[in-house]
Amino acid sequence: MDILRIATAGSVDDGKSTLIGRLLYETNSITKDKIEALETASKRKGLDFLDLSLLTDGLIAEREQGITIDVAHIYFSTPTRKYIIADTPGHVEYTRNMVTGASNVKVSLILVDARQGLVEQTARHLSIAAMLRIPKVIICINKMDLVQYQESTFEEIKASLTELVAQTTFEGQDVSFLPISSLYGQNITTKAEHMPWFTGNTLLDELEAFEYAETLAHASARFPVQFVIRPMTEAYHDFRGYAGKISSGTFQVGDAIRVLPTGQESTIATIEKFETKLSNAKAGDSVVITLSTDIDISRGNTLVLASETAAPQLKDFAAQVCWLDHQALTPGNTYLLQHGINITKAKISQITERLDVVAQTATEGVDSLKLNEIGRIALRTAQPISADVYAKNPSNGAFILIDEFSNSTVGVGFVQ
């Protein structure tokens, strides 16, 4: 049974936590004692219905404010597949949490309040979904009950969002629209009795039917070395293994490999996983690889196939960045750049453009990027990094920028 990773997104109070609670409730994924606790908590708030958002708004601050701050991971399953949902914050102050929560998902559920329509934070979340290359985006027009389930309202919002989607850089991604009511369970797991005019799938049907190809297994092979194993025991006196997680592609015993950045070459002798010898391993597998010759390999080196084009050694390059700090990004600033497990200093050479997420237009010649703004930059690193263009190999094309004094993550970037 496969696992589908999903992330919710949307502005504050668009109903993300309620939607997830509804999915859990209607798929019988909530225990009896939790339902009883939910009933008690809902009555305490003076409600005559189950406040399903309380299932995921776990932090005390979230319950008091009625918003999601941290990224909560929720698990449920159907007879078809298992699901992991990242309930990400909608408030603009917590956009960084949304970027983190959506970084490795296959489906993004972007909620829109039917009363509000398109707002800036919705446009920002669409831009982030496009930037992260999330394969499927479902735009859920929620709270249809508050607009009397009017088809005209849904179509009006859909039209404005369709225009925005057309202007956004979605490449090979599927974008669809659903009218729903999380509060009353309309079009979540069963057809909406109050919206007979909508003939499409329910949300759960969309999720169940979604199929995706694991593209990373077919990308260029990359194996970042996380740890060098040298037991130095009687039984394993000469053993030298390289442990890590294959980030993309496939490696087989007998493959000729090249080490980056040194350029040394060798051949794979064995691949082991949990002390079991394998003939091959693919993206996502955590393994230990041994080579036929003793060469100098350290933590942070990357193994690639000698027959493939090696990841370029980048020192001066361009990137798209989402800025996550209150202190603006300006040319000349220096940060720590972390790519995989490697960290080096990086200096911002230039901000080439800033994206207007609503108009989907770029402004050139800007001198800063402020909190939650998206733009393109040029930067120079102290040491080269073995990185691919993000669009071709997402697992090896992303990085973060870190403030070297506060150690806070201030930006997330994508190599272009």
Task: Walk through the language-model features, giving the residues of each.
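Conserved catalytic-core segments of large NTP-driven translation/proteostasis enzymes
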Residues: 155, 163-299, 304-327
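C-terminal effector modules of nucleic-acid-centric enzymes and ribosome-associated factors
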Residues: 5-9, 146-149, 153, 163-166, ...
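Conserved Switch II/interswitch segment of TRAFAC-class P-loop GTPases
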Residues: 81-83, 88-94, 102-126, 130-155
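Helix-rich terminal scaffold detector
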Residues: 2-29, 41-44, 111-112, 138, ...
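Residue-level signature of catalytic and energy-coupling elements of molecular machines
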Residues: 13, 19, 38, 66, ...
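Conserved nucleotide-binding/hydrolysis micro-motifs of P-loop NTPases
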Residues: 14, 25-26, 91-92, 115-119, ...
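P-loop NTPase switch module centered on the Walker A-proximal segment
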Residues: 1-93, 105
